[in-house]
Design a protein with these regions (language model features):
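Helix-rich catalytic cores of soluble enzyme domains
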Residues: 1-91, 95
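Acidic, glycine-enriched catalytic cores built around paired aspartates
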Residues: 63-78, 83, 87-166
């Protein structure tokens, strides 16, 4: 089991909202979406349906770039024929999504997005408070980030057995 489509959309809308203030004349934000390889079913027919449904959902994020992950890639490296088929499935899903009702406005999506934004702001404030006063950017400071992990503000299970992750 994974995240529901509505909650996955809320999560990514929260991420978009949180990074939007970074956009200025010197910094652009380009949104690229793709399906997670591990989310693809191994069954070929199910994988085709998953590719279409996931593409349709991702269009709610209005990506600048859509990265196609072929429906066969959970089973084997995509062949030329697999890629052509995946492109056809994806193209149709995108065409269907254009002009569709705006899933971003669903009340449950908006409610969860706002919860995630608020929780993330609390976390970012807590990380900022950990930094010494002479640190210009606490969110890019290795010592501050390491401290946030060791104090349990952020998870980093992949560092458990890494001497630098302590």
């Amino acid at each position: 089991p994974g995240t529901s489509d509505a909650m996955d959309l809320a999560k990514m809308l929260a991420a978009q909202e949180l990074i939007a203030p970074l956009r200025d004349g010197q910094f652009n934000i380009w949104t690229q979406t793709r399906i997670g390889l591990l989310s693809h079913p191994l069954d070929d027919q199910s994988a085709r349906g998953h590719l279409a449904a996931s593409t349709y959902l991702q269009m709610a994020l209005r990506p600048d770039i859509y990265h196609i992950v072929g429906h066969t890639e959970a089973d084997h490296a995509a062949t030329a024929d697999d890629i052509i088929e995946a492109v056809k499935i994806t193209r149709r899903a995108i065409q269907n999504a254009l002009g569709a009702p705006d899933m971003r406005q669903a009340p449950e999506v908006q409610t969860r997005k706002e919860e995630l934004v608020a929780e993330t702001r609390v976390l970012l404030d807590a990380i900022r408070e950990l930094a010494p006063s002479d640190v210009a950017d606490p969110w890019a400071d290795p010592a501050t980030l390491a401290r946030s992990v060791t104090l349990g503000l952020m998870d980093a299970p992949q560092l458990r057995n890494n001497k630098f992750g302590r």
